[in-house]
UniProtKB/Swiss-Prot annotation:
Residue ranges occupied by any Protein kinase domain in the UniProt entry: 33-402
Segments of skewed composition (Low complexity): 210-269
Organism: Dictyostelium discoideum
Gene: fnkC
InterPro entries associated with the record: FNIP (IPR008615), Kinase-like_dom_sf (IPR011009), MATH/TRAF_dom (IPR002083), Prot_kinase_dom (IPR000719), STK_FNIP-Repeat (IPR051251), TRAF-like (IPR008974)
Protein name in UniProt: Probable inactive serine/threonine-protein kinase fnkC
Domain MATH positions: 1025-1154, 1172-1291
Amino acid sequence: MDNNNSNNKNNEESNNIVIPILSEKEKKHLYEFEIIRILKKDEFSTTCKAKKLSGQFNEKRVNFCIIKIIKKRVKKFDSKKNEIIIEIDPRKEREILEKIKHICVLEYYGYSEDEDNGYIYTEYIQGGIDIVETVTNKLLKEHSHSFQSEDIIRRCAFQLVLLLNHLHNNLHIIHGNINTDNVLIADQEFSLKLFDFSLSKDISYYSKDNNNNNNNNNNNNNNNNNNNNNNNNNNNNNNANNSNNNTLNNLSIVNNNSSSSSNDNSSEAEGGGGGGEASITSTISTILSGSSSSQLSTPSTSLESSFSLEINLNDSSCYLIAPEIRNQQKITSKGLSKKSDIWGLGCLLLLMVGGDPKITTNFEPTIPYHLSNNCKNFIQKCLIQDPYHRWDTNLLLTHKFIEKTSFENSCNNQNNSSTTTTTTINTYSIENEENILLINGSNGMNEFEEIPNYITTLKFQESFNMEIVNEMFTDSIVHLEFPQGFNKLDFNELPDFLSTLIYHGEFNIESNYHSKSLKPRDIPKSIIHLQLPNYNLKIRRNSIPDQTKFLILGSDLGENEIQSLINLPPSIIDLEFGCDLELILNFLTQEMIPSNITSLKINSQQIFLPFKRSNPFGLTNNIGNNNSNNGEQFNIPIDELPLSKDINDLMILETVEINNLNQLNSNKLLTLTNRVGKLIFSKEFDEPLTIGCIKSRSITSLKFNKGSRFNQLLVVGCLPVNLTSLEFGDRFNQALSVGCIPPKVTHLKFGRCFNQPLKLGVIPDSCTFIQFGSQFNQSLEPMVIPSSVKELIFGSQYNQPTIQGTFPDRIKKLVFSDDHDQFHSQDTLPKSLVHLEFGESQNFNQILFNQSSSNLIPSLTPPPPIYQKLTTFIFNGYFTVPLKVFDLPLSITHLELPQYNDILEKDCIPSFVKTLVLGSSFTIIESFINLPKSITSLSFGCDENVIGLINQSLIPPNCNTLKINGQSISLPITQTLQIFKNPILPTESSLILSQQQQQQQQQQQMDLSVEYENQNFLTTNTLNQGSWIISINNFSNRKDQFYSPIFSLIGSNWRCKFYSNGKDASTSGKLSIFISNCDLLNNPFTIFLEKSISYKLTLINQKNPNESIQKSSSHTFSIKEFNHGYGSFIGLFSLLNPNNGFLVNNTIKVRIDAAPTSPLVNTYDKYNIGLNQAFSYSVPMMSKKSEPFISPIFMSCGRKWIIKIYPMGQPSSNYMSVFLEYRDEGEENVHFSLELISQLYPEQSIKYWVQYRFNSKSNSFGYPKFIGVSTLMDPDMGFLVNDTIILNVSILQLKPIKKSFGFL
């Protein structure tokens, strides 16, 4: 016994047990209990583990319990040192605990009180030592600070969601403080117990229907409490021997039929309701401000009363609080909501998987990559910033991550929760249907004038077709839904406070209200949930807001539209669209999918991520007892499926590839199920197909591989009757009889060798798309191509004359390839055309859009509008005479004439053209003055004798994209353009390389002559002043360092450099802003320049400009000090708080005011400059490099050099480091530049010029923080393209000029 006692004592000492210290009054009230130890003590309450010496709880004998002693009055001092008495009503927590009966909540035993304190008694869990502990303690014991098994995470998530669903929907209780300190792990099976309801809120009392009943209950409760107080006072005056039942008399008897979840194990855990040594309210206590301003408002017995706790924003734990509460900088009873509990659940799960709930500039916590997509998606749904779109418990219970678990049955026995609602990926929750208003437009504007303030959702019915203006909407409207027939929506009239937009309108035509395709900033930046079910057009960059998380597009995306998905913002986590299955297998890649997406649906079917073309749909893990990781899908060969399995219950791979007919007849998937959507015949397949050989009726797509040998005659009935897509291989060249192509085929594609005559009726009337191979050259009689065809593409050898009726009247896209050179007029070209394309052999004089005029006789009057729908015209052929007015239809908006190099007469280009491509040898540059103002994109080519004539006055005023010789030109044009000389490959004499290095080297060198010619560009001495405003969009997704666009001010070029989380460790958590002189960075002769200015940086408050932040300074900018600014401009939390007004629509604005303080200093005449070649180094597979590496040796200034790169930084791990290293003897004084090329936006390349004297001892110089790794890897920045970066090095040799002196 002595040994055991000593061991127990040692164990308790090792656990840092707090010695019980209670007041005499508390000890007197708790005379029936032996206080074993105090678990937690703060200024508001004391929680302790106790042993009951006698008596029972609710007629049930227990040995141990948890007692929470809550002070009714607490003394504090305000900022003026005035004493404040804070009153607390502990009965509010009691009233909540009395209502709860759930397996995942510590059982409530009772309540008592005296004049100073309230006492709450709850269950103490008994189990094995070191088993019962909080999630916080468990994480601290794990070396990886996370639970490795995702099954544990799933089990914990399921328990907590079931509990919250019960609390929110059945009991109408909000917990308000869900975190790792308040969740207890009760056993080795990870059964959870939630406790500490001190911040909880009972929202049932706010129900309009129950107000009267609640008031009565309140009065009764108050009377009972007063009686209890009187009893306590009387009993305290009696002797202890005569008061054995005093405590029991004051306990609220509830849950008489409940059974404790504790077991009968003899050993007890040093934990229980208090969560071991962890503080029950430790999370709240650490995030509350320690200043005297933190107060609780005086509670009362009224259930309408509220509390207020100020939040310490400097504590990292504040991120555990829901953002809608954290932004108010205080926790209030009114601020708590069901969705704030969901945020706490997401943070708890994130900590369990090793994540960090801290929010950086991307607005949301980062979720570890090792998790399954289902798990990541579940956590993402819990951690959505906007509470309107954060999933509630009903939606979470339908999530795939927890939809099936072994814990479900045991929980259902204890939880009579309400039925859950089945939902899909595109579901968003609106808490009350009373918040929805249906608008039919019958009363006109009167309907909008009468919208109540509690309405949050407007749904427009089919009869509504009024114009929408911004003034119609009140600030409470956050959800809008428009019907399919609505066609008068101007996106610019939508308010900025919307979070959900569902628009069923059409985008196939351009209207007076919106363009055919979405443009940047069409959709309000505040939109989080966006549904465009009829949008089947290209996605432009920045057309989808950066905060959008849920996106639904159209059901008929094409190849170009699929490839444009790469322009979607990385914020999207759920994406859904539809397209032909063939496009998924041939064009969709993982790189096109937003990086944070965890749920992808195509054609209403879930796509498994990361996306693999070989298995886009995969198999689920409910086949046998396979050990699939984390509930993810896996692939099993179809022929290996056991017949005993219920295959129809599986999600089967939609595509099956067949090598021979025996496999076709024996394949279990084809013979037992109707789940196959696409059948592919391999290259080796070349057997006749017989009637009924393909039994599955679910097949809608049949394809013979491109190199397939199949060349067998098709008989009627050999192909599946429900086929909608048919694609032949290259070898197929058999005559087709009527009926051999199934009647439902809509997509028909022939291979290279097919060149058979087609009879009337061979192609079914259902067909909408036909593409012929390169060898097809048969005449087509009228009606052979059915009227249903909308897209017709011919191969390169097709060159047959066309007559009226050859092409259907409803065709929209017609493409002729290279050999076609036939005459076309309005009699042969359908009037329905939207897209028309000709090959290189076509003569433009043979195409007459206007029958009344020709290219030889100019038309003086506009022709009748015959081709009103033609918007795209691509003509790769040649011209013999210049274009005349009305040669082209006036409806064209996209025009490509890559062989046109002649004069542009006035009005020869239609006035609606927005995109124009001209020839590669254009010489008559002055005729650009005749181009229409509508042009936004212009591309052409010219030689060096012409390019110098181009100036901004010749460019259309609305043009924002200009390409010359394939290179992007920055607009506006402010200086004479120059042609870069052709790249020069290094010779054997200029590089000292091994033979292997020479084979691998593909670097190119550039000529610096252009920079040499512009050396005097910076020598202006203009002493004016000016200002510039910079808008930084998508700020929350910016990481590390980034730059503003270049701007001109006081005779120089500048840009601002930002550090999103501080420049260094001392400024972490701050926004750093510096101004950089780009002339000093980009020009090789800036070593001789010094520019002194005074400047002021202003972070504009976009809601209240008077509260903008300004900081002023002065600086002399030189090659050694080309940056200057502030490392701690503003704290990130203040910046990101939307209530402060600095970040609006995810955009910040910075104003720069500058004035020179002295003229420009130039010391150019002190040096001789040796002009030399630059070295370009292309680095492939950059994302896979982690160790330092060097470039091949290159020669410059007669010396040997290399570039040394540290992909993960030297010494900083968040930046790529780049150094120039001297590999020769002697000493060399040089002026050199290091440049990282932006391959998408060359004008935004990063380039630094610097002077350094190299020798054998100091042989290396460069930049440890050349560029942030996250910025480098960001595909939108353009530095990393095809996993390749390009580094350029330019070196100038500097030699001082020796002046000679003479005597007279």
